[in-house]
Amino acid sequence: MSLNQYIRPVRTKLSHISCIRNISITQSSINTTIKNDESISKTTTIPENIQQAKELAGYRALEIPEFKTLGSAEGTTATATGSSSSSSSSILSINVPPSVPVYIRRGSLLSIYGIQEISSIDSVRSQLQFPNFWKRLIYGGYVSGYQKLISTTPFSLLISSKSRSSGSGGGSGSGSGFEKSFVNLVLDGTTDWAILDKSALQVYTGNSLSITMHKLPKFISKKLSRSLKKDKKSKTNTNKLETGLFSWKKLGYTLLSGRGKVGLVGNGSSSGYGSSIYNINLNQNEEILINKNNLLGITVNGPYDLQNCIVKYEFPIINNANPTNTNINIKEPVTIVKPKLIQPTTWNLIVLKLKNFNNGFKKFFQIINKYTLGLKTTSYNYLAGNQDFIKVIGPRNLLLQSNTNKSHRGFNNIIPRNKPQAKVWPTNQTTTKVDESSSFSTPKDYLNHVTIEPGKGAVFKSTLDFSETVESIENKNKNKNKSK
């Protein structure tokens, strides 16, 4: 690089002197072609040079709550598309992102804790709400309170499947002897869920999730009635068939729609072994018979779709006269008689009255026979415990719980369950021996001692008291000393 400087004075004054300075720079050209080198696109930074900035971990990017059941080896998520599995866990863990509210049933909260060091449980705010207060009171006869939790920092929750508060869930939660288990629903907006158990909704979240109460349909829809009439094998009367869901004790159900996550609880076995909630996927035109008390939830398309897939079912009674005929709703063929003109004589009037009386007498006995068969069927299903069965027609997704809060009615309730039973001990014989004395006899403690006798070695003996044994040993020693 060459540098030439020229300074030329222009004017000289006593008060001011101005100069002009010219600079010229000469530089050789540089090749601007970028080589395909990986080192050019790399940047390195020493972490110690960055201060006053916290590292962004993966949990900071949490946008939706994460539901995870504890104590279950399998997955416990049931989506609206049909993929799900059973659940056997009674505790639900939830990781909640910032500014996302979570609603849990009153009295079911176990623990609140932060996610590592960036969270603070002091920022968690709580609010008690009663959603659908009047509808739940009218349709279900219960009121459920839910605790709204929200925080500006991420936090985690532990939720119990049972509620400590009395009366939550309509009086069907904490008092029963059955275990409760969680199952998680992920709603993507394509399919809605009808929850028939009023105590099943334990926790939910989602800004676009809608939870409403609707009345249970008493009769099936005309669409389902027409489809049943098209079935040639079915000879039942489809006029005003009942769904079997409606009862004066239970008038409504909960409809879940929109997008969000829901944690449901169902009744499991009292022993706690195995799974308690199962998912059944029905394809098109598939049918299944289930007890309505075990039906936890079913997929629907809106609030008026429940009457398009469920029909009340009663097990038919086998007729003793004709065992092969198991259908009780077969109609007898009706003969249509054309009216005839007769002469209005006295004899013809008597014959006409006798025929009318005979026809009326036959109709009377047909009505009695019809209601007698219906009474027999109802009585049989009631005594057998099959009075609550319904038929579900696919395509549907069903959630079934293995037990219910309602015990089976029938002859089983006659046997007292709180009666203490005697202990039964197995033997090698074909009969069993009842140990009656075990409940009255008191246990005794036996003491063992060892004596070494010549020619016999160590001899083990048991005694109730050591005093006799000690006296006998002392007497033996005295005799030995005297003999010496």
UniProtKB/Swiss-Prot annotation:
Keywords: Mitochondrion, Transit peptide
Pfam families in the cross-refs: AIM24
Keyword Cytoplasm: no
InterPro entries, sorted: AIM24, AIM24_sf
Principal place of residence: mitochondrion
A GO BP entry: inner mitochondrial membrane organization
Cellular component, GO annotation: mitochondrial inner membrane
Subcellular location(s) of the protein: Mitochondrion
Keyword RNA-binding: no
Family under the similarity heading: Belongs to the AIM24 family.
Protein name (record): Altered inheritance of mitochondria protein 24, mitochondrial
Biological source species: Candida albicans (strain SC5314 / ATCC MYA-2876) (Yeast)
